[in-house]
């Protein structure tokens, strides 16, 4: 859920896995993955279908001249903000990482696209018009060189950087932003959230010339830049865009404005995916992109078993490893000579951003779960405190109800329901489950057992379900544990074919939390939406619509608090735990800035601040062969610590 970004739909965390890696999917057909980007720039070819759409919607797609740009605008460029990359960073080398399963598609929108691998193609790779600074208030330039907010705080003007190019050499121009709205408003993409957002949140886009546009929001916003700072869509790439879009573009990789691209030759089916850095990337020397995205290549090897991946990391076959969960990797399995001898370094970095909603999502349209008393009983029967103390060894805290750590929108007093066996039994009794069977599980008068399936995929959370199962049984609830491949679990969630799923959403800092995609009834029951709980509460629907239309921050805060109360009362989302830091290990040849990372980092490599020093790699491997040691390194950075 990156602010001011083309990616506004949060990605489902099917796995919390290897560093720079999260759960992905499985490719179903051995078709071509990515067309090789040509060396020479392509000429821009008009998209006739899109142009016809513009003509059919003249109030939305406007064409004016540079003389029509208001003369009194105050243009900004973010140049007063500090940089956050390290000038000492070295460009070059190959980075070795791992993925737990194969991505279900290489599309960036449409069915199955909202998977965790997309971050490497789009979310953390593509460039927006502008982006929130990760350490300080304000925005940094991206595709836009300068921007200006109109006095009505409803229209934002952008001057596109003439240096900006797609990875295939085609310049980024105003036409790509015009096409973006056509693309996301089209039913062909089979993405209801995008259709709604790009139709309801914006009223027009104006092209003044090839490098000047204006985006008009539905109404004035407290932070209009966040809504208007979008990514472009390459119009020239989608000449074949139509009703068969999901199938036609299933394994095609669209050109990117970011530093890394994917070529067909670098997709080894079922083995690895390799990203290549563009040698002449247009933003190489821009103030806020210099000294970032440094490795020439990033190799993602398919390693389905997390313990095997850790062994590869110890051998130096992977450059880094996510040590956040499960904590046994940090506390136990890092007690190794490679750490003591300084070959592998340990890092903890506290972040400050809204906490990703992770916990139990209850499908309220399934039998039993369609009963509020059952859902409330499950909330009381979920012993997250024990999960935190045992599975997480105490270095986490209970997640608050929706919008945790998103002041002032988070609820000031409301907290997640605690584990309470007596209250769980009382709730189950109200639903008719009053007697225990011979194994202690509750049954109703018809003899039906209080039994539900808990689906999860993340090997990083493998210690959590057994604790939840054991504690729930004390309250008469049977949880049948179903662990699936990340792709299967992700697709099951998107098809709404689960009963209870243990999962979370990738998040990020933005002005205000989102509710529509998660809880509005229009997204209930439908596949490929983020309303996993199938929530459909009339009052909540009305408040969400009012919240999304609101032009007043104080009103939005009030509405947010009330919506959180309704979500909490519905008990279809049982908050799990959160950890206000990221934690990883890396071989000493993977270098990080002295500042280590940025305040809003979701994972250590998100902002591309690290680099690979191949000379240090050779030195380290030779030292290991010779038995020589270096200084032991364990960094703990608390400058952004708040909880």
Describe the residue ranges of each PLM region:
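Surface-exposed binding/hinge segments that line
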Residues: 27-28, 90, 194-243, 248-251, ...
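Detector for C-terminal structural segments
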Residues: 27-42, 46, 78, 266, ...
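N-terminal lobe/hinge region of extracytoplasmic solute-binding protein
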Residues: 61-83, 92-151, 182, 255
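Alpha-helical secondary-structure segments
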Residues: 96, 173-180, 210-216, 259, ...
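Gly/Pro-rich hinge or "lid" segments in bacterial periplasmic/extracellular proteins
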Residues: 104, 111-116, 120-135, 230-297, ...
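Aromatic-rich, solvent-exposed beta-strand/loop patch
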Residues: 145, 167, 216-236, 253-305, ...
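Ligand-site clamp/hinge motif
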Residues: 161, 248-249, 281-334, 469, ...
């Amino acid at each position: 859920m990156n602010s001011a970004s083309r990616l506004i739909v949060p990605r489902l965390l099917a796995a919390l896995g290897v560093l720079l890696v999260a759960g992905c999917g499985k490719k179903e057909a051995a078709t071509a993955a990515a067309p090789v980007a040509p060396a020479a720039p392509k000429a821009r070819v008009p998209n006739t279908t899109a142009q016809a759409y513009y003509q059919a919607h003249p109030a939305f797609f406007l064409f004016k001249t540079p003389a029509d740009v208001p003369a009194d605008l105050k243009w900004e460029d973010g140049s007063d903000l500090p940089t956050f990359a390290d000038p000492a960073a070295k460009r070059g080398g190959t980075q070795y990482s791992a993925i737990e399963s194969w991505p279900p598609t290489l599309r960036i929108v449409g069915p199955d696209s909202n998977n965790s691998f997309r971050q490497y193609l789009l979310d953390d790779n593509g460039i927006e018009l502008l982006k929130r600074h990760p350490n300080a208030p304000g925005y940094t330039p991206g595709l836009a060189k300068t921007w200006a907010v109109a006095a009505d705080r409803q229209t934002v003007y952008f001057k596109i950087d003439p240096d900006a190019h797609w990875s295939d050499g085609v310049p980024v121009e105003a036409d790509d932003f015009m096409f973006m709205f056509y693309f996301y408003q089209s039913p062909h993409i089979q993405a209801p959230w995008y259709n709604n957002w790009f139709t309801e949140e914006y009223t027009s886009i104006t092209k003044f010339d090839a490098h000047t546009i204006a985006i008009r929001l539905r109404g004035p916003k407290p932070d209009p830049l966040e809504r208007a700072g979008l990514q472009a869509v390459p119009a020239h790439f989608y000449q074949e865009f139509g009703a068969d879009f999901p199938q036609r573009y299933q394994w095609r990789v669209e050109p990117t404005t970011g530093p890394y691209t994917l070529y067909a030759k670098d997709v080894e089916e079922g083995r690895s995916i390799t990203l290549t850095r563009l040698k002449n990337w247009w933003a190489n020397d821009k103030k806020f992109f210099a000294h970032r995205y440094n490795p020439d290549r990033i190799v993602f090897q398919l390693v389905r078993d997390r313990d095997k991946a850790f062994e590869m990391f110890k051998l130096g076959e992977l450059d880094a490893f996510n040590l956040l969960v499960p904590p046994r990797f940090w506390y136990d399995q890092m007690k190794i000579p490679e750490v003591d001898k300084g070959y592998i370094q340990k890092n903890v970095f506290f972040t400050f951003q809204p906490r990703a909603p992770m916990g139990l999502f209850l499908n309220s349209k399934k039998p039993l779960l369609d009963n509020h008393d059952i859902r409330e009983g499950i909330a009381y029967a979920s012993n997250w405190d024990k999960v935190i103390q045992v599975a997480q060894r105490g270095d986490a805290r209970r997640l608050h109800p929706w919008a945790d750590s998103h002041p002032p929108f988070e609820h000031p007093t409301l907290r997640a329901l605690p584990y309470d066996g007596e209250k769980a039994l009382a709730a189950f009794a109200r639903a008719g489950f009053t007697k225990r069977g011979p194994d202690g599980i509750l049954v109703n008068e018809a003899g039906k057992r209080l039994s539900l399936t808990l689906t999860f995929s993340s090997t990083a959370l493998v210690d959590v379900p057994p604790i939840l199962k054991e504690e729930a049984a004390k309250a008469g609830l049977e949880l049948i544990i179903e662990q699936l491949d990340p792709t299967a679990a992700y697709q099951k969630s998107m098809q709404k074919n689960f009963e209870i799923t243990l999962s979370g959403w990738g998040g990020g800092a933005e002005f205000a939390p989102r509710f529509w995609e998660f809880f509005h009834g229009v997204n209930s029951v439908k596949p490929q939406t983020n309303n996993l709980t199938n929530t459909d509460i009339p009052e909540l629907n009305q408040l969400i619509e009012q919240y999304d239309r609101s032009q007043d921050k104080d009103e939005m805060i009030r509405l947010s608090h009330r919506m959180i109360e309704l979500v909490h009362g519905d008990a279809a989302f049982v908050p799990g735990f959160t950890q206000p830091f990221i934690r990883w290990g890396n071989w000493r040849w993977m270098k990080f800035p002295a500042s280590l990372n940025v305040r809003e980092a979701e994972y250590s490599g998100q902002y591309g601040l690290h680099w690979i020093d191949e000379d240090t790699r050779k030195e380290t491997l030779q030292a290991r062969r010779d038995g020589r040691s270096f200084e032991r390194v364990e960094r703990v950075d608390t400058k952004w610590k708040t909880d």
